[in-house]
Every structure is written in structure tokens, then in C-alpha cells.
Amino acid sequence: MGFGWLLIGEMLLFPITVGFFYTVPVAAVFLCLAGYRLARVNRPFGVSFYLALLAGVLAVPAIVLRVIPATDGLAHYAEGATLLCIFAWHLAALTGMAWVTKETGLVKLHAVAYRNRIFCCIYFALAAFLTVADGLPVSEEAGRFLTGANYAVIALGLVVLALNAYLTFRAYANICMPEDVEMPRPASHFRFIKQ
């Protein structure tokens, strides 16, 4: 259905919590595949396709600017723009997830999707702010504060992305397209276990 691609793309986004943007273009490919497959389910998944495409495109200059030593200051702004695009993708994907879980009657997953949207808002706002602030000239004391805040945001990011991956896995396990016919369960080779 597309939730498998979504799960792979979500797992590839884990390194962005520590500022490692090199996996974002690869994750964007999987997220685009998921958005394309899930676009027929509801509109927010269609929007997530375009946002994943934009995130993949924005990640390339962020990577290039990070590699070139003279442009390290500009890399923070490119990474901030990439984070905002990934944030918008998360909002669209989680909205689509909330809609589809409501339609299928999965009340707990519906509540989890809305809870994850709130956590994503908090995490990505802090991460984008700290990514841009990291490139600014600050005093030594402010630099120590930003370093400590970065560690807290990294921990929060790992929790948020793990919660989103869990939600995606649960949706993958519980939701299928209406035209999909459930396959009959194959006979067990160990009949004595079922008896």
C-alpha cells in the first residue's frame, strides 16, 4: 500500500537528529514512493509526495555546502530550510495517517497520529532554530548553552522519529487497500502445534 516505503524513509531520517543530512536524498526517494502510492488514499499523502521531493532537492545544497569548508556558515541555513521542509512533510504525512486511521476505525492510532504531530512541531521548531543558531557567532557561554540544548534536541528527535516509525509500522500492519484480498493462511507443516 505504501506504508512499507514510508517506514523505510522514516528510518533513513534518523541521522538528521545529529546533523547528518547525507541520508536525506535517499530517504526522499522512499518517501516519494510512499507519497505516490498513498496519494490515492487521501490528499495529505499527495502533498507529502511533493514535500519529500522538495526535501530531497534542498538536502543536496546542504550537503554540498557542508563539504566545502569556506561555505560552512551557509550550510546551516540550507540545513534549516531542509529541516523545515521535512517538518512540513511530517505534518502532511501524519495528517494523512490520522485521516486514514479514522476512516478505518483505528481509534488508538488516530490519537497517536495527532499526538505525534504535536511532538513533531516541538522538535522541528527547536531543531531548525538550533541549526541556524549554530552558525551564528555567539559568546563562549552561549555556545556552551547551545551545545547542551543540541544534546537535548537530539534526544527529543530520536524519540519523535521512533514514535513516528512505530506509528507507521502499526499502520503498515493494520491497514490495507479495500481491493486487496486477504491471502488464505498456508497450512502449517507442524500440525501438532495447532492441535
For each feature predicted by the language model, list its residue ranges:
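Non-cytosolic membrane-interface motifs at loop->transmembrane helix junctions
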Residues: D72-L83, G143-V153
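Hydrophobic alpha-helical membrane segments
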Residues: C85-L94, V112-G135, N150-V160
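Membrane-interfacial loop-to-transmembrane alpha-helix junctions, especially the N-terminal start
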Residues: M1-G4, V41-L53, A113-F119
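Membrane-helix boundary/juxtamembrane motif in polytopic membrane proteins
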Residues: A98-F129, A171-I193
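Juxtamembrane "helix-exit" motif on the non-cytosolic side of transmembrane helices
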Residues: I63-L74, L130-A142
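Membrane-interface helix-boundary motifs at transmembrane edges
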Residues: Y36-F49, A70-G73, T101-V112
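N-terminal topogenic module of multi-pass integral membrane proteins
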Residues: M1-R37
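Generic alpha-helical transmembrane segments
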Residues: P25-A28, L58-A62, G80-G96, G157-L161
